[in-house]
Every structure is written in structure tokens, then in C-alpha cells.
């Protein structure tokens, strides 16, 4: 797996940061919203505009507290299970995807569904279906219980085993060691995933790779940007929610790449001034489900403590955009 994937996007470049005197912020680029999150959030906004409140959303549309609270104030109602949605109502499926059984449940309740599953998650679903049809054992590297993993595993429950971490490899048993493939959750740490795959391949030498990288371009790009700046930072602040897999991974990557400390915050107010004691360089990034307004709040908070020099660290240029679900696309003139 390459260290970063730009999906054919031109303009990717590495940025050299010149050292300045005094306190400074290194600001990772890219950061924040990915194409799948942007699409999912806009899907709920457009559904509210088109149909009016309430619009039901199965699970948090994306894993970010601010985004969910903002959409809830606009009229979105977030539920955990399909049977919480009134019969005949409109329901949006979150960016993380759902298992086929959820579509069946929705049809039984005569729900009008809008599927905001990220297309890169849908790609992994299709891979699971394809290899299950060919009777492979599918080893899904991912976090047990995460919505995305539940949805992908649900495509082929008799063929999929979830491998949560490198140590879980010891417990994996397959029917035919020559018909085994690994797939992964899209928001994992690249390094930890590769360690899990290395250990799987030690156990199953003919283990097949996915047709293309399952860890999404945005997850990889954000991790690469953090790796580029972390060695120069005494502290890295990751803006993101605790239930956001890709945001939590950024904290881990920052620590692994050399930052003395790294913390996850939802809001600027979550920053403890004690974190800044003796610090001259703070790195700032944000998870793929984080709107830029929250990053700006963090920069303002840091400026109050003398960190008013902001230097970008650019490792990729993202221009990818996904089309909205057909149910809420604007009508053609």
C-alpha cells in the first residue's frame, strides 16, 4: 500500500516548513471534510429543504457532535434502529453504510429511503459480495461494532470474519487457506492495518489483497500530513469526536510520528491551557467529518495564548467530489 493515495488528483505536493522564532502553529493540509462526508451532510440538508422536517437519519450521519447537533436543530431526528422510524416516513442511511437486512426492514415499514453511504464504503461492500459469491473466506480488518464494519460484514455474514487488531490474527480460522482475501474498514490507521495484514500473511501465505486500497484516500492523506508535521511539534491537537475512527487514528499517528503529546478535542473550549506550557510548536489537524469552523475556533483559541503564526503543511491537494444520491439531486431543467 502506498503512503498516500491521491485518487488521480493533481497538485499533490510536499511542503517544507521554515522554522520561525516564537510560538507557531503547523496546520495540516489536507484536513477536515472528505468527499463522502460532504456528500452525506449535504444529503440531509437537501432532504430537509425538499421534504421539510422531520427527516429521520439512521445512526449519526457522520461521527461529529457539532454536525449532528446542527442537523438536529434543523429538523433531523437521529435513531439507532430502523423500527424507531414511523411507517411511511423518510429515512437517510448514514455515510457508514448499512447491511442488506436494514434495507429489508425499511421496505417492510414502507420507508422512503435515501442512501448517503460513502461511495468508497459501497466499494468495499461490493468487494465483500463478489468474493463471497466466489466462496472466499473474507478477513475484514476493522473495529468490531463500528457501523461501517457491521454494514460490510452484513453483506456476507457467513464468509466474513472481523479482525480487530494484529493480536486478533491468532484466533483466525479459515476453511481453505488458498481462498482467503483481506478487506478493511475505510478509516483505519494505515500502519496498524499493514501490521495486521503482515501477520495474516505469515499465517496464510497465499492471502489475497483487495482489488484496490480499501482505506480511503482522505484517511491516508490526513495521516500523511500529520506524519509530516508531528516530528516538529511538542503538541498536536486533532479536532474530532471520540466516536470518529479516523480522528482517533490521527492522535495515534501523531504520537507515533514523534509529537510529545496529542489530544482530541470537539471544540476550542476543550483545550486545556496546561497542554501549552513550555510548548512552542503546536500541530493542528481535523478528522474527515469535521467542518472547518471548528478548526478556526481552535486557531483563535491558540492565538489567545500567543500562537498567532500559522504555517500550512501541505502533502496533498484534494478535489474529489461525489454526486448526491439520486433521490435528492436537483431536477434537470
Swiss-Prot record:
Keyword hit for Iron-sulfur: yes
Sequence positions that bind isopentenyl diphosphate: 63, 96, 146, 244-246, 289
Keyword Chaperone: no
Domain of life: Bacteria
Name of a matching Pfam family: LYTB
Binding, [4Fe-4S] cluster: 34, 118, 216
Pathways per UniProt: Isoprenoid biosynthesis; dimethylallyl diphosphate biosynthesis; dimethylallyl diphosphate from (2E)-4-hydroxy-3-methylbutenyl diphosphate: step 1/1; Isoprenoid biosynthesis; isopentenyl diphosphate biosynthesis via DXP pathway; isopentenyl diphosphate from 1-deoxy-D-xylulose 5-phosphate: step 6/6
Binding site for (2E)-4-hydroxy-3-methylbut-2-enyl diphosphate: 63, 96, 146, 186, 244-246, 289
GO terms, molecular function: 4 iron, 4 sulfur cluster binding; 4-hydroxy-3-methylbut-2-enyl diphosphate reductase activity; metal ion binding
Catalytic residues in the record: 148
Sequence positions that bind dimethylallyl diphosphate: 63, 96, 146, 244-246, 289
Keyword set, alphabetical order: 4Fe-4S, Iron, Iron-sulfur, Isoprene biosynthesis, Metal-binding, Oxidoreductase
Cofactor annotation remark: Binds 1 [4Fe-4S] cluster per subunit.
Function (record text): Catalyzes the conversion of 1-hydroxy-2-methyl-2-(E)-butenyl 4-diphosphate (HMBPP) into a mixture of isopentenyl diphosphate (IPP) and dimethylallyl diphosphate (DMAPP). Acts in the terminal step of the DOXP/MEP pathway for isoprenoid precursor biosynthesis.
Name of this protein: 4-hydroxy-3-methylbut-2-enyl diphosphate reductase
Species in which this protein is naturally found: Mycolicibacterium gilvum (strain PYR-GCK)
Amino acid at each position: 500500500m502506498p503512503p498516500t493515495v491521491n485518487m488521480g488528483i493533481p497538485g499533490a505536493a510536499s511542503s517544507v516548513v521554515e522554522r520561525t522564532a516564537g510560538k507557531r502553529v503547523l496546520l495540516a493540509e489536507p484536513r477536515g471534510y472528505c468527499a463522502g462526508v460532504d456528500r452525506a451532510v449535504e444529503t440531509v440538508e437537501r432532504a430537509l429543504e425538499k421534504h421539510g422536517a422531520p427527516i429521520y437519519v439512521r445512526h449519526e450521519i457522520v461521527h461529529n457532535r457539532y454536525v449532528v447537533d446542527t442537523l438536529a436543530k434543523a429538523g433531523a431526528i437521529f435513531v439507532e434502529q430502523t423500527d424507531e422510524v414511523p411507517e411511511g416516513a423518510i429515512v437517510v442511511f448514514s455515510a457508514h453504510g448499512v447491511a442488506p437486512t436494514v434495507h429489508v426492514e425499511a421496505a417492510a415499514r414502507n420507508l422512503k429511503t435515501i442512501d448517503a453511504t460513502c461511495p468508497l464504503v459501497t466499494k468495499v461492500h461490493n468487494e465483500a459480495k463478489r468474493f463471497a459469491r466466489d466462496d472466499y473466506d473474507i478477513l475484514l480488518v476493522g473495529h468490531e461494532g463500528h457501523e461501517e464494519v457491521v454494514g460490510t460484514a452484513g453483506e456476507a455474514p457467513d464468509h466474513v470474519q472481523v479482525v480487530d487488531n494484529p493480536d486478533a490474527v491468532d484466533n483466525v480460522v479459515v476453511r481453505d487457506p488458498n481462498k482467503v482475501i483481506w478487506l478493511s474498514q475505510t478509516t483505519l490507521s494505515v500502519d496498524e492495518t499493514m501490521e495486521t495484514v503482515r501477520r495474516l500473511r505469515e499465517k496464510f501465505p497465499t492471502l489475497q489483497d483487495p482489488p484496490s486500497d480499501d482505506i480511503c484516500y482522505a484517511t491516508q492523506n490526513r495521516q500523511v500530513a500529520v506524519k509530516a508535521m508531528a516530528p516538529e511539534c511538542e503538541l498536536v491537537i486533532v479536532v474530532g469526536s471520540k466516536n470518529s475512527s479516523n480522528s482517533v487514528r490521527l492522535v495515534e499517528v501523531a504520537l507515533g510520528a514523534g509529537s510529545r503529546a496529542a489530544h482530541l478535542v470537539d471544540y476550542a473550549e476543550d483545550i486545556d491551557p496546561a497542554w501549552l506550557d513550555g510548548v512552542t510548536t503546536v500541530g493542528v489537524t481535523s478528522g474527515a467529518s469535521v467542518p472547518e469552523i471548528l478548526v478556526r475556533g481552535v486557531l483563535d483559541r491558540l492565538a489567545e495564548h500567543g500562537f498567532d503564526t500559522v504555517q500550512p503543511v501541505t502533502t496533498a491537494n484534494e478535489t474529489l467530489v461525489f454526486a448526491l444520491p439520486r433521490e435528492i439531486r436537483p431536477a434537470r431543467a
